C-alpha cells in the first residue's frame, strides 16, 4: 500500500509529498482532472455530499497502488465514515501531519494558489470549529504523527523517509 499523507488544510501534505522523490498522487488534483473544473466550482454546483462520494471512489483506487508511492489526501477526506474505515485499514502506512490551528490558519490565508471553499465561506471562529471537528476524526488513523508547526517541509519529508 502507498504512504498516505493525512491532515487538515495547511499542514503541508502536498508540499511534503513532492519532496519525497516518489511518485505522488494528489487526490485533489486527480478529482479536478476527473470533474474538469476546480473543486471550489464543483462544490458550488454539486454540493459537498456529491464531492465526498467522488472523493471516496478516488481514495479506494489510490489505496490499491503499490507501496513505492505517495498519496496526498484532501483535508476533508476523513469526513466520510467509509473513508475513515478505508484509512484505518491502512493506518501503518498513513502519516498524519498536524499543525496548531493558528499555524494552519495563517498558512491557508497566505496561500494564494489554492482557493479552499470551506476556508472562504467561514469566519475565523467557524473555521476553528471545523479544525477541531476534523482533528478529532483524524485520531487513530495513522501510526505516524508529525507536528509541522516548527518544521520546514524538507524536515517533514526526512521524518517520513526515516519512519
Swiss-Prot record:
Name a GO molecular-function annotation: shikimate kinase activity
Q: Which Pfam families match?
A: SKI
Q: Which cofactor does it need?
A: Mg(2+)
* Chain positions recorded as substrate binding sites: 28, 52, 75, 134
**Which BP terms does GO give this entry?**
amino acid biosynthetic process; aromatic amino acid family biosynthetic process; chorismate biosynthetic process
Q: In which pathway does it act?
A: Metabolic intermediate biosynthesis; chorismate biosynthesis; chorismate from D-erythrose 4-phosphate and phosphoenolpyruvate: step 5/7
Instruction: Give binding positions for Mg(2+).
Output: 14
GO CC terms on record? Answer: cytosol
Keyword hit for Transferase: yes
User: By its UniProt entry, which InterPro entries does this protein fall under?
Assistant: P-loop_NTPase, Shikimate/glucono_kinase, Shikimate_kinase/TSH1, Shikimate_kinase_CS
Quote the EC number.
2.7.1.71
Q: How is the cofactor bound?
A: Binds 1 Mg(2+) ion per subunit.
Subunit structure as annotated in this protein's UniProt entry: Monomer.
Write out the similarity annotation: Belongs to the shikimate kinase family.
What does this gene product do? Catalyzes the specific phosphorylation of the 3-hydroxyl group of shikimic acid using ATP as a cosubstrate.
User: What is the official name of this protein in its record?
Assistant: Shikimate kinase
Q: What is the lineage of its organism?
A: Bacteria, Bacillati, Bacillota, Bacilli, Lactobacillales
Gene, per the UniProt record:
aroK
Amino acid at each position: 500500500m502507498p504512504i498516505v499523507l493525512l491532515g487538515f488544510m495547511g499542514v503541508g501534505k502536498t508540499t511534503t509529498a513532492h519532496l519525497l522523490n516518489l511518485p505522488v498522487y494528489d487526490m485533489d488534483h486527480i478529482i479536478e482532472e476527473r470533474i474538469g473544473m476546480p473543486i471550489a466550482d464543483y462544490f458550488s454546483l454539486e454540493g459537498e455530499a456529491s464531492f465526498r462520494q467522488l472523493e471516496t471512489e478516488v481514495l479506494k483506487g489510490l489505496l490499491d497502488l503499490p507501496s513505492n508511492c505517495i498519496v496526498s489526501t484532501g483535508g476533508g477526506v476523513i469526513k466520510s465514515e467509509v473513508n475513515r474505515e478505508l484509512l484505518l485499514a491502512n493506518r501503518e502506512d498513513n502519516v498524519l501531519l498536524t499543525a496548531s490551528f493558528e499555524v494552519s490558519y495563517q498558512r491557508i490565508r497566505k496561500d494564494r494558489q489554492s482557493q479552499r471553499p470551506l476556508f472562504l465561506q467561514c469566519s475565523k471562529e467557524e473555521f476553528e470549529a471545523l479544525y477541531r471537528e476534523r482533528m478529532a476524526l483524524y485520531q487513530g488513523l495513522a501510526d505516524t504523527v508529525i507536528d509541522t508547526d516548527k518544521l520546514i517541509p524538507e524536515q517533514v519529508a526526512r521524518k517520513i523517509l526515516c519512519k
